[in-house]
Structures are given as structure tokens and as C-alpha cells.
């Protein structure tokens, strides 16, 4: 029997309490909400908009956009015929999806467009069509690697009024150990970067703008992690860092918000921090900054929060682990799912919530008009101010935590 109404569980909030070393979760934290809507594994998560929307992608190619002010879906469609590998917001009204059907798509989806889209979740047994948003770009890519795309804004943005630009890194179409870098909106391939050595397939990627140039970070099947820098003068790619802290394939990597280091996780139990070498470096660095044996193998979807204070991983053991961004010490273990967690995402901790209604400005000072803030406005303000951490699991459910 199909599910006709999307359900979510409102669970008691566990307040965050400080300790002498870091503000950590209490001993038995609980998720604020469980979002139930996918019948297949949740493989990708991303907060979009002003923290009030969460995009989730599953193993059957469905994407659900959740309105976190009411904890309900506001748009559901199937952008791909196979599993979703990655999702990312781009600007105020664009969402990028990357599927195992060898396609990377960019969709225009403003809040005003949501009314025209289906709200029937993948769990719903329905014959109603699920219209797709407006498709802006579609690129044929290689997805044999299970490696999600990476993206960054070019260091030389276009003039005001022109279409926004973006660089995308994906595994090479023919050689799964090499990397292609595409440009949007032209959809042209700008670079093909070869692997420095026999490292097997590319498993995880990141792009880091540095001055007027670019650094490409990659994790490989054999546990090797590299940094390769594009010379602005010659247009060639040079390896600036190479190390092998992992004995198993790299599963994920993410760059610290200051752009000075990045952290990798693997099928082994190691979490390692690496330098992002400066562009002017003359030698190939080989030593990671820190290597931690966490004793917990299979941590993936490693993500920093944008204030750099913490990063999190999803574990094959169903645990979500939160680490200090500074010391790399484990500061919280979030347990709710019964099976492996494949995706995690942080909402922005730096975005200022938009002003709620019922306010006015007097002599340069914002003053609230008593009694004029609606329930919806309070919900919006809470959704935008919450320090959300979302975790997606093999069970198709998404746990939503409000952490320090």
C-alpha cells in the first residue's frame, strides 16, 4: 500500500552543552526530525537557499527538495535514471545533480518555481507525473568511479550582468584515473589532468581557487591523495603534494573553509589532514599535517561546516561522527540509524538569517512591531538560524540534527 502523506517524526530536542575543551553534544543526543520519503538509499545531501531547503538524492535517481520550515517536500523529480552521486546548490536558484547515468545536470529552481512541481515523494505509490524543473545545462560525464563532481567559481568572474560561471571537475570520460575540468555556461572541457602515477580510479575531488590560478585535489583507489596546481603562466598542471596515508580507497575529502588544508576519509579507519600547498611551491610535499586512526573504518561523505569549527562523516556502522576542525578530536557521535550512513551535509553557520516580518526601521534602528510576527515567519527564522546537520542512510531516511 502506498504512502499518501509524507511523514516526519518530531523528536525532543537535545540541547548542546559546553565542555572544557569544546562545546559538544550531550551523552544521548536525539535528531530534531526524521524525514521519510525515499525508498532507496540516500546517497547525496545539500542545503540550498538560505538554510531553509535541503536537497536529497537517492539510489534510484530521485531528488527531493525539503522545506525545513514545515519539514515537508516542496519539489520532487527524477533527474537521473540511476543513483545520484552528488548534489550542490549554485547561486540562489540553481541546483546541480550528478547521476550514475553518465549525466551532470544544472536545474533552475527558484522558490517561485516550486508550486509547479510535484510533492509526491518516491515512497508514494502514484501514477502522477513528476515534472522536472527547467534544465539549463546537461553534460555527458564518466560515472563508473562512484566519484561525485567538484565545483568552484573561477577566480576571474564575468562582468556584472553576464551569465554566472562555474568550473566542474569529474573523472575523465575514457580514463578513470584522469580528471576532466568543464566550464559553465559554455559546457566546454577546459582541462584534462592525468594522475601522477598508477593510483587506480579517482574516488574523490575538490577544486580550490588560489590567486589567479587553481589547485585540484584528488583521492584515489589505492589510498593516495594529491594536489595538482595549474600554472597561470604555462597552462600546465604540476603536482605539488602527494602522500598515501590510507591503506584502502579514499572515500571522501573536503577543504577547510580557510582553503589552507583538506581532510580525507577512507575505507580504512584513518582520517588525515593535508596541506593545500601555495602556488609558488617549488618542491612536492609528501607529509600530511596530521593522521588520526579513529578505530572506525568506512567513514565517508566528510564535510566541513563553513565556520571551520567542526567536520562530520557518515559511517558504514550507521554512526555520524563529528570532529573538531582544529584538533580533529571526536566531539560527538550521533546514533539513530540502524544501517550505514552514506551522506552528510551541514547548513551554513555563517549566513545571517533574513529579517522576519513585523519589523520596521526607526532612525536606523530595526524595531519589532509587537504581535505582528506570524507562525510561518517564526518557522522561517528558526530554519535559517539552526545549525543543521543532515545525515542520509541506506534505510532511505534522513535524520536532521541541530548541533552546536
Swiss-Prot record:
A Pfam family per the record: WD40
Gene Ontology annotations of biological process type: chromatin organization
Any one cellular-component term (Gene Ontology): nucleus
SMART domains: WD40
Disulfide bonds: none
SUPFAM superfamilies reported for this sequence: WD40 repeat-like
Keywords: Chromatin regulator, Nucleus, Repeat, WD repeat
Compartment(s): Nucleus
Residue span of region Disordered: 1-31
InterPro entries in UniProt: WD40/YVTN_repeat-like_dom_sf (IPR015943), WD40_repeat_CS (IPR019775), WD40_repeat_dom_sf (IPR036322), WD40_rpt (IPR001680)
WD repeat residues: 37-76, 79-117, 197-238, 245-286, 294-333, 370-404
Signal peptide as annotated in the record: none
Family statement drawn from the similarity comment of this UniProt entry: Belongs to the WD repeat ASA1 family.
Subunit and partners: Component of the ASTRA chromatin remodeling machinery complex.
Protein's job: Component of the ASTRA complex involved in chromatin remodeling.
Protein name: ASTRA-associated protein 1
Gene: asa1
Amino acid at each position: 500500500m502506498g504512502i499518501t502523506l509524507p511523514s516526519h517524526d518530531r523528536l525532543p530536542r537535545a540541547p548542546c552543552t559546553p565542555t572544557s575543551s569544546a562545546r559538544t553534544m550531550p551523552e544521548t543526543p536525539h535528531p530534531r526530525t526524521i524525514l521519510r520519503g525515499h525508498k532507496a538509499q540516500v546517497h547525496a545531501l545539500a542545503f540550498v537557499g538560505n538554510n531553509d531547503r535541503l536537497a536529497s538524492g537517492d539510489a534510484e535517481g530521485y531528488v527531493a527538495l525539503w522545506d525545513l520550515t514545515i519539514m515537508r517536500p516542496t519539489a520532487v523529480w527524477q533527474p537521473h535514471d540511476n543513483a545520484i552521486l552528488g548534489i550542490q546548490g549554485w547561486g540562489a536558484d540553481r541546483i546541480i545533480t550528478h547521476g550514475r547515468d553518465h549525466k551532470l545536470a544544472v536545474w533552475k529552481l527558484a522558490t517561485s518555481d516550486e508550486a509547479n512541481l510535484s510533492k509526491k515523494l518516491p515512497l508514494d505509490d502514484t501514477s502522477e507525473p513528476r515534472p522536472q524543473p527547467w534544465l539549463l545545462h546537461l553534460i555527458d560525464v564518466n560515472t563508473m568511479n562512484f566519484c561525485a563532481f567538484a565545483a568552484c567559481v573561477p577566480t576571474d568572474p564575468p562582468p556584472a550582468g553576464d551569465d554566472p560561471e562555474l568550473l566542474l571537475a569529474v573523472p575523465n570520460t575514457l580514463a578513470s584515473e584522469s580528471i576532466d575540468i568543464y566550464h559553465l555556461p559554455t559546457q566546454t572541457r577546459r582541462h584534462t589532468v592525468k594522475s601522477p602515477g598508477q593510483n587506480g580510479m579517482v574516488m574523490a575531488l575538490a577544486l580550490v581557487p588560489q590567486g589567479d590560478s587553481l589547485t585540484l585535489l584528488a583521492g584515489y583507489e589505492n589510498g593516495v591523495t594529491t594536489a595538482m596546481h595549474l600554472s597561470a603562466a604555462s597552462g600546465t598542471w604540476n603536482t605539488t603534494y602527494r602522500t598515501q596515508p590510507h591503506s584502502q580507497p579514499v572515500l571522501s575529502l573536503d577543504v577547510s573553509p580557510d582553503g589552507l588544508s583538506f581532510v580525507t576519509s577512507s575505507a580504512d579507519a584513518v582520517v588525515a589532514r593535508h596541506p593545500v600547498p601555495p602556488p609558488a611551491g617549488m618542491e612536492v610535499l609528501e607529509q600530511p599535517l596530521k593522521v588520526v586512526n579513529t578505530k572506525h573504518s568506512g567513514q565517508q561523505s566528510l564535510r566541513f561546516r563553513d565556520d571551520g569549527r567542526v567536520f562530520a562523516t557518515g559511517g558504514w556502522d550507521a554512526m555520524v561522527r563529528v570532529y573538531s576542525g582544529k584538533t580533529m578530536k571526536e566531539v560527538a557521535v550521533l546514533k539513530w540509524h540502524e544501517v550505514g550512513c552514506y551522506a552528510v551535509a551541514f547548513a551554513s553557520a555563517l549566513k545571517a538569517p533574513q529579517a522576519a516580518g513585523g519589523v520596521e526601521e526607526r532612525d536606523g534602528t530595526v524595531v519589532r512591531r509587537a504581535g505582528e510576527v506570524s507562525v510561518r515567519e517564526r518557522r522561517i527564522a528558526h530554519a535559517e538560524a539552526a545549525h543543521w546537520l543532515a545525515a542520509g542512510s541506506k534505510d532511505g531516511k534522513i535524520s536532521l540534527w541541530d548541533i552546536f
